[in-house]
Amino acid sequence: MVAYNGYTGAAKLNATKTIHAQTVKYISAEIQKCSLGESKFMGTNQDCPATAAKAVNGAVATMNDKNPYDTANNAIKSGTGFVVGQVSITATNTTTVGIKTCTKTGCATADQMTAGISTE
């Protein structure tokens, strides 16, 4: 039973890391659509030009990954805190999307991932 718990714990941790990386990649790619002359971004959910607030709203609306630690909830949510299994995204200012992810219960500093994405 202990080995199984270790396996599921590692799977949840790795799934959370993957969701974080995919979120950063998706938001970055969607913001680039505006730079390339598209009129909409975030899966046609938001109008160009891209702002941090539009990117946050669009990501929350279009990304449906589940929190590996609490599958009743989505992993991508608007917020500023570290919540286990959650990718918290916020507009830190008009041109920067801040991303915070906690990969393991307890959210120790070693278990925190952060990123910043510019809309410019």
What are these regions (language model features)?
Residues A29-E120:
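Periplasmic/extracellular, small/polar-rich flexible segments of pilin-like filament-forming proteins
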Residues M1-Q22:
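Amphipathic alpha-helical segments typified by the pilin-like N-terminal helix
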Residues Q22-S28:
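Oxyanion-binding/catalytic loops of NTP- or PPi-dependent enzymes
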